[in-house]
């Protein structure tokens, strides 16, 4: 089992933003966290990657893989850096914490990431010169450093135009063939196109948790779960 969460709660001030969250996600699943804005999706993801703590110790109620890649909704890119320079910086940072690599291996890792996410033609540019779609590819490449077992993507297609949207969705589908992916979205079509399973969250509670193959009408299911 890639992810196991048991009875997780989170308060922010007096607001109970996550209520008794329980879920199990298997290896190789692509799971969509679907819900309206403010439902608790991003909060759950931040707890999973260790940015925030749950009310009780996360060690007792979250069992996660050792390696996790994370793409936050507001992707912090250093726009003055070149694409290769940016990725090399994060390879140095990440690999220092995980294991030692020689300069040659680090360079090879950067080139593999660039090729994997389709950045070859843009790799010589500064990050700030890239379109929104290519910036998301840079963010995905950063999240994949170290070949993580689990990839957590918070609203990965926000702000993309229709062509960029389809490109990033196709890329995430490809990435999801050999690892577990959890992505958050409020777009139903996104879940239909990319996910094998949907978890609908509203007001901090899981309302629906089903394989997509068991859902005949996602729109109706979503409406009924979020009334």
What is each residue range found by the language model?
Residues 88, 92-95, 99-122:
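Conserved ABC ATPase "signature" region
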Residues 165-177:
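Helical segment within the ABC ATPase nucleotide-binding domain
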Residues 49:
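Helix-to-loop junction immediately C-terminal to a conserved catalytic motif
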Residues 34-36:
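The feature captures the beta-strand-to-loop junction immediately N-terminal to the Walker
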Residues 3-5, 18:
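Conserved structural motif at the start of ABC-family nucleotide-binding domains
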Residues 151-155:
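Catalytic Walker B motif of ABC-type/P-loop ATPase nucleotide-binding domains
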